[in-house]
Amino acid sequence: MSGLKHLRNRVKSIKSTQKITKAMQLVSAAKLRRIKDRAEALDDYSSILTNIMNDVKLNINFMNLSPFEQKFFNEDIKGKPHLCVVMTSERGLCGSFNSQIIKAVKRDIVKYQEQNVKVKLIIAGKKGYDAIKSQYSDLIEEYYHITKEHYLPVALEIKNKIISLTDQDKIDSCSMYYNEFKNALVQVMTKVSIFPVETLNISEQKENSKLPDSSFEYEGSNLVSSLIDLYVIGMIKHAFLQNKAS
């Protein structure tokens, strides 16, 4: 009888665990849908800004821009360090989520150094910081802890840091590393150039543009600087949401 009672309790425990697991799956699926929807909405916004920045690059006279603004469009400006913005997670147990990014960053650091280009690092996420600091602590300009839900203040701080370093003429180019979400099982390690802005080919312009006509005059002393500000924060928020979804 004791054996039968133990078996009944065991069955009851398993059923209870199954219910809890099912509830957790439903909650996780709902969270993923929300994050995915937000990421997709921001994709459109980022695409529009990228297309406008590309249009500025192709049509504006660099001589009319400030030294700060020129760095975002003129690929010939060189001599200062390259800034790498590294997006990782706070915790482990993510498979190759962090390791792919860390390997890519370390590989690029070596490549830049071989070309006699100095490197500065901005790292978001404890796993990236822990993996990089032992070897490249002297390159780390800033490290940001990512709170569980409120990534926006961190994104704003990173944007301000990038703008500040550029305005102070401490860097002349910047790239960002993060994971692009594809589906619940697949994410792709992605490296993008924040600046100088990469020139899009015709097919990319058509794919990215949500504007009926992007040919217009850029007037006003602060218009380009304001556009740069929106563009940089848009890129960073996009990377954060893609990482979160992944």
Language model: regions and residue ranges:
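C-terminal beta-strand-loop-alpha-helix "lid" module of Rossmann-like NAD(P)-dependent dehydrogenases
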Residues: 1-246
